[in-house]
Amino acid sequence: MKNYIDGGEAILEAFRQLDIDYVIASPGSEWGSVWEAFARQEREKTEGPKYLNCAHETLAVDLAIGYSVMTGRMQAVMLHTGVGLLQGSIGIDTAYRQSVPMVVVSGESLSYSEHDGFDPGPQWHGVLSVVGGPTVLASGITKWSQSVSSQHTLYEQLIRAGEMAQRSPAGPVYMSVPIETMLHDWTPPQAPRAVPPAPKPVPPAKDIEAVADMLLNAKNPAIVAESIGRDPAGYSATVELSEMLAIPVSECRWLDFTNFPKEHPMYQGMGEPDYLKDCDVVLTLRARAPWTPPSAKPANAKIVNIDETPFRPHMVHQSLQADIFLEGDAIATLQSLNSIIRDRIVDAEVSQRWEKWSKVHNDMVARNKAIEADGLSKETITPIGLCATLSALLPDEAVFVDETITHRPIIIRHLDYRGPRSFYTAATGGLGQGLGLALGTKLARPDCFVVSVIGDGSFMYNPVVQSLTLSKHEELPIFVVIFNNMGYSAMRKEHHSYYPNGLAANNSTSVGHTITDMDYAELARAFGFYGRKVDRLIELENAIKEGQRAVCSGQTAILNVVLDEGDTSI
């Protein structure tokens, strides 16, 4: 039995040095060298990443995203040449847009069976080759894409890729690794260096002090947050700043993460509240699109933007309208700002602001509760009634992973989630990722009750069979709640808004809206999971409790909730 030390070992050793927990794979035939290295790792009891096999590329990438979002730790994804890269591209694009670090690798062949004594297989020259190499497929959705140069550079190129992925702005990087390179002998470095964490640069102290002075002198400041809450430290720093100066906090329409406690007196909801027009200083925290249209900034306010990368390279149009940019690590910058304000004498007007915004918050809560009470008074199930019932029954520590479109504003307003990382959404426009993100969340937090709230249209885009298979084999039970409005409501809404007096609007039809009716709960039973369809409010509480018990016993549950089409709030 020969012990091969080749390019496969170089790849695995690079992942070890990058402190990666999982190599998540939907692989192809090129990865024999890496599998051999994993076999060696197991035989020799070497510490290193675990290998997790998926049956779908998008699922593999989304598992890595969900895991990284919940842990703050970069993971690796292994795909099959260009075709696998294309299949996983929607997930890679999400990672790019949400600044999730990730090392993505796929293989290629350079010899195409022309090398005497080595035949990678006829598929490489016949159907799998990509003109220009697979890197051309990844260049628009990654920070950096490159083919490995040789067996001599393989290890350090992967290390560099991982370091680059974690540098600001964080994001996925891609490397194509030729089979021929992986099969070459490799000599490990005698003293491999420990890869240091990425630095966290902050703006100049004088700039932070100037913003502190602005906030201390402001009569009517406000905070607009989009994704500062992705890290619990950002969530806590936002709360501290708001409390010190009694600053109201609203969340952007396209929030990716919960950023502020919904029950806090300074929380003012989601969207673009009217009070922004009267503010004199508005602080935007990791906000790529704080208002719509982009040019419609609060007219009377000085805008201060705190972000690692204010100008997102993936956005075609972005008009932040900021007067001051504190560009650098957003959390470290916010913490520095807090430390300055903490040592200053706070104006007496702060207590008056606290009273004012507490009342506004309480009024908002009262309105929401009244709306929820109305939803709970009906025989059918409205989206608001569903959110209120889930809030009443599910544990406070539950994590909600959202992939809805039309119902997202309702969910954000009426679903009670508590604490940092309790709500996460892939708000990039690319559907078909909710189940993978939820499973990645469960992989990262196995003791947590994870809920996938997902529209019926979004559900249909997901690799459902592969996701349920992974859930079963890896023992990752999640609670899937389908907001089933029996169609693509977002498509119908936009169609009718473009043609309000058109044929479709006047006849209540839309060819782009229809989804073939099916009972999604039946899919659960094929895997031995819990599944139930419910369309009456009187049945909902029991169905949720049954699903919760199933998840707590180790089974994934799918609750197909048929919503009242008469609900005009959507």
List the model feature ranges, each with a label.
Residues M1-I345, L393-D396, F449, L468, ...:
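N-terminal alpha/beta PP-like core and its mobile active-site loop of ThDP/TPP-dependent enzymes
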Residues M1-K2, S149-H152, N300-T404, S508, ...:
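Phosphate/pyrophosphate-binding active-site segments
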Residues I5, G28, A205, P232, ...:
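Conserved structured core elements
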Residues G8-L18, S29-E30, V34-F38, K359-D447:
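Active-site diphosphate/adenylate-binding microenvironment
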Residues G107, L285, I306-D307, D402, ...:
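Active-site flanking residues adjacent to catalytic metal/cofactor-binding acidic residues
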Residues H115-L128, L276-D278, Q318-S319, E327, ...:
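Thiamine diphosphate
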Residues S176-E180, E226-S227, E403-H407, V561-D564:
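Short, well-ordered beta-to-alpha junction loops that form the rim of enzyme active sites
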Residues E226-D231, G375, G455-G457:
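Conserved short loop/turn motifs at secondary-structure junctions
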